């Protein structure tokens, strides 16, 4: 019953339903994670079931209070030295500034995620450029100016958190040759709300990823490409709560040739940054590893 998953049932009711179903999840990582958390943080060896759910609820609640088990407590006692969030270039990183001042045991950085500037066919592309312009405190009237704004924000991210990693999500990617003039024309067309052909989208994204990689390289960033993201799978929920709120999932696309051409072209000019590539589809790991 969805009521006990994302519905309006209380957290206690959802917990009891979770305990009821957990014994049937043997072989699923959730079963292992639950057992690990009970042992690691509460020293409880018993498997969680409907029969002992109330007892475990009471014991863990008491321990949480006695040990002041906050999220930070859990990270420190798990010896978590580094946590990386991921933020859009327009983010002001206010909470990262607060964390820096508090000198936590766990270091918290962010990964630079410029996806929205890559998705030129999105209806909100022009609106996003206006926000990026405000964040970078400069006009953006061309593809070149957008790249300058993104580099300024990347350097700001590095200054605030010390990060040296990007987070580029690629749903699918075909390399398409382009000229600077063609890309500027596509940028202008997208910014004005014009309908782009698939070839134009491929050209723009090729130019975007190529130029961002060069920016990463000269700023000593690691380029992280996670590939095969199926974005906004639940459109009704995306409309109600926004993008990047839990409604993306794994696709089975494997744009090996496109990414290969991108990396080859960067290698040819000697500007390939350190790179991490991983597919969201676990069955494609061997494809990308080799």
Question: Language-model segments: which ranges?
Answer:
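H/E-rich (His + Asp/Glu) clusters that bind or coordinate divalent metals
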Residues: 240, 246-261, 265-268, 274-290
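Short hydrophobic/aromatic-rich motifs at helix boundaries and adjacent loops
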Residues: 65-69, 232, 259-263
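Metal-cofactor-binding active-site regions of metalloenzymes
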Residues: 1-219, 271-290
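Histidine-centered catalytic micro-motifs
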Residues: 1, 222-231
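Non-catalytic scaffold segments within catalytic domains of secreted glycoside hydrolases
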Residues: 178-187, 227-231, 235-253, 265-270
